[in-house]
From Swiss-Prot:
Record's protein name: V-type proton ATPase 16 kDa proteolipid subunit c
SUPFAM superfamilies membership: F1F0 ATP synthase subunit C (SSF81333)
Organism whose genome encodes this protein: Entamoeba histolytica (strain ATCC 30459 / HM-1:IMSS / ABRM)
Organism ancestry: Eukaryota, Amoebozoa, Evosea, Archamoebae, Mastigamoebida
GO terms classed as biological process: asexual reproduction; calcium ion transport
Subunit relationships: V-ATPase is a heteromultimeric enzyme made up of two complexes: the ATP-hydrolytic V1 complex and the proton translocation V0 complex. The V1 complex consists of three catalytic AB heterodimers that form a heterohexamer, three peripheral stalks each consisting of EG heterodimers, one central rotor including subunits D and F, and the regulatory subunits C and H. The proton translocation complex V0 consists of the proton transport subunit a, a ring of proteolipid subunits c9c'', rotary subunit d, subunits e and f.
GO molecular-function terms, A-Z: proton-transporting ATPase activity, rotational mechanism
Keywords: Hydrogen ion transport, Ion transport, Membrane, Transmembrane, Transmembrane helix, Transport, Vacuole
Biological function: Proton-conducting pore forming subunit of the V0 complex of vacuolar(H+)-ATPase (V-ATPase), a multisubunit enzyme composed of a peripheral complex (V1) that hydrolyzes ATP and a membrane integral complex (V0) that translocates protons. V-ATPase is responsible for acidifying and maintaining the pH of intracellular compartments.
Length: 177
């Protein structure tokens, strides 16, 4: 694999630094989604711990925010794997590299925002549902919509990772512009 990277055709469309931008997309995808998931888990776990002191029987129902926060990291992992497949190809254009960078940032930052929303709403929701059980459904709805933020970024990242040209040879349409 290292030999194929060293033997890449270096042209104006495929400079030697193209993999750097793709690698930054991979890094952004996994790092930001894991940060979001970790924040969501930690923040909502504080609420679960305090609820466990008041009402120990409510702990099992209270783990929903932790599950939702854990799923965010999976989105980043899937995008990370797809982008890695693109970066390790023998021809890797600058166009493809920037698309991969955008895909990684999209998935990662949406995952970070989603994790923060899940953590805050999960913490408050768990505490509120322990005092008033009718709030549990409202908490779940807030968590679902918070998770949807990460899902939107995941879908856009998949579209970006699967589209775009990855050719190091100028075509007739690109050379006439």
């Amino acid at each position: 694999m290292l030999m194929s990277i060293l033997l890449r055709s270096v042209t104006e469309l495929c400079p030697v630094y193209s993999p750097f931008f793709g690698s930054m997309g991979i890094t952004a995808s996994i790092v930001f989604t894991v940060f979001g998931g970790a924040y969501g888990t930690a923040k909502s776990s504080v609420g679960i711990s305090s609820v466990g002191v008041m009402k120990p029987e409510f702990i099992v129902r209270s783990v929903a925010p932790v599950v939702f926060a854990g799923i965010i990291g999976l989105y980043g992992l899937i995008v990370c794997i797809l982008l890695f497949i693109n970066v390790t190809k023998s021809e890797y254009s600058l166009n493809r590299a920037f698309l991969d960078l955008g895909a990684g940032l999209t998935c990662g930052l949406c995952g970070l925002a989603s994790g923060m929303a899940i953590g805050i709403s999960g913490d408050c929701g768990v505490r509120g549902a322990a005092q008033q059980p009718k709030l549990f459904v409202g908490m779940l709805i807030c968590l679902i919509f918070s998770e949807a933020l990460a899902l939107y970024g995941f879908i856009v990242a998949l579209i970006m990772a699967s589209t775009g040209e990855n050719s190091c040879v100028a075509t007739a349409s690109s050379s006439s512009a």
